[in-house]
Curated annotation (Swiss-Prot):
Database matches in PANTHER family: DOG1 DOMAIN-CONTAINING PROTEIN, TRANSCRIPTION FACTOR TGA9
UniProt entry keywords in alphabetical sequence: DNA-binding, Nucleus, Plant defense, Transcription, Transcription regulation
Biased amino acid composition, Low complexity: 118-134
PROSITE patterns: BZIP, BZIP_BASIC, DOG1
Biased composition (Basic and acidic residues): 148-159, 176-188
Compartment(s) of residence: Nucleus
InterPro entries: bZIP, bZIP_sf, TGA_domain
Quaternary organization: Interacts with NPR5/NH4, NH5.1 and NH5.2.
Listed name of the protein: Transcription factor TGAL9
């Protein structure tokens, strides 16, 4: 009971060490006492076969200390204390504390040796008298040591449990990191579906655009072929040299006018030949034959005038497309071009008729 004030001043780490040393001292004391009991057992036996009460007390104390030591060892779990409840690097104890710890560690051994020596020297009556104080003192100190051991075991259990929880959380986080890719949620799936639909529509639009381009190209080639065919047909209608003249540098309208004018000149020459023949065949004397010849000549003159109207229409048509070709006079025959070069004017229809 005299050791309790300085025990309360120790730090938790020192208290735990002190409790462990006290327990070890008690075990050594009990073992020494039990050895002395067994050594003197044969000598102390009375003729009646009974044992001394002090010896029984020492035996019970030894058995209780063995049970408590085994229970304290079993209560400590065989686990790795990752997060200890006590600081790992405690401060250095003071010289006073170190001396007190040395005194604590040496006191149980000295007490055990003294008790063993006294029990071997004293008679049975003195041993019985000396056994009573040990029975009164040791059980009072034993519960405090066992209580401290229990508290330390509980603290270790709590620390081990906390470390296990932290270790479990770390292992679960590592397992979640090493797991495969998680399945996407509904929002991601909806976005992926929208992207696929947009890509499909884009491909369809591109295909339709390409088809339109191909159709336009085919239509353009068809129009070009139709235009070439029409040009060839028109050239065949206008004359053999019309299309070649148009290719040589003239416009299509100028080439068409040249062809039409060439045909008009041919028909005009035939009409002029018929008119000359009618004039020559006209009779000198009047009569029925003279009246018929005059009527025929009038018809030929009316046809020639109408034929000149066709030429005017042709000139009007080409003037709206290529007036410079009409003014230059390249479409005229060589004789008319000569008159234009000499006099700077165009011969009248009267000169044409007369010639």
């Amino acid at each position: 009971m005299g050791d309790r004030p300085w025990q309360q001043q120790l730090q938790p780490h020192d208290q735990q060490a002190a409790s462990c040393s006290v327990t070890a001292g008690m075990m050594m004391q009990a073992s020494a006492t039990s050895s002395s009991i067994h050594g003197n057992n044969i000598i102390r036996k009375d003729p009646g076969g009974g044992y001394d009460m002090a010896e029984l007390d020492h035996i019970f104390l030894y058995l209780n200390s063995q049970d408590q030591a085994s229970a304290a060892i079993q209560e400590q779990p065989q686990t790795l204390n990752i997060f200890p409840s006590q600081p790992m690097h405690a401060g250095e104890p003071s010289p006073k504390g170190s001396s007190s710890m040395a005194a604590i560690n040496s006191a149980p051994s000295n007490n055990a040796l003294a008790i063993a020596a006294g029990s071997s020297k004293r008679p049975p009556a003195a041993a019985a008298a000396g056994g009573q104080p040990s029975r009164l003192n040791n059980p009072a100190d034993q519960p405090s040591a066992s209580g401290k051991d229990g508290k330390a075991a509980v603290v270790k259990k709590e620390g081990g449990g906390g470390g296990g929880k932290h270790h479990g959380g770390a292992s679960s986080a590592a397992a979640s990191e090493h797991e495969g890719p998680k399945t996407p949620d509904a929002k991601t799936l909806r976005r992926l579906a929208q992207n696929r639909e947009a890509a499909r529509k884009s491909r369809l639009r591109k295909k339709a655009y390409i088809q339109n381009l191909e159709t336009s190209r085919i239509r353009l080639s068809q129009l070009e072929q139709e235009l070439v065919q029409r040009s060839r047909t028109q050239g065949a209608i206008l004359g053999g040299g019309a299309f070649s003249a148009g290719i040589g540098g003239q416009s299509p309208e100028a080439a068409w006018f040249d062809g039409e004018y060439a045909r008009w000149v041919e028909s005009h020459e035939r009409m002029m030949a018929h008119m000359r023949a009618a004039v020559e065949e006209q009779p000198q004397h009047g009569g029925v034959a003279a009246a018929a010849a005059e009527a025929q000549l009038r018809q030929l003159v009316d046809a020639a005038v109408a034929h000149h109207g066709v030429l005017v229409e042709l000139k009007a048509a080409v003037a709206s497309a290529d007036v410079f070709h009409l003014v230059s006079g390249t479409w005229l025959p060589a004789a008319e071009r000569c008159f234009l070069w000499i006099g700077g004017f165009r011969p009248s229809e009267l000169i044409k008729v007369s010639t």
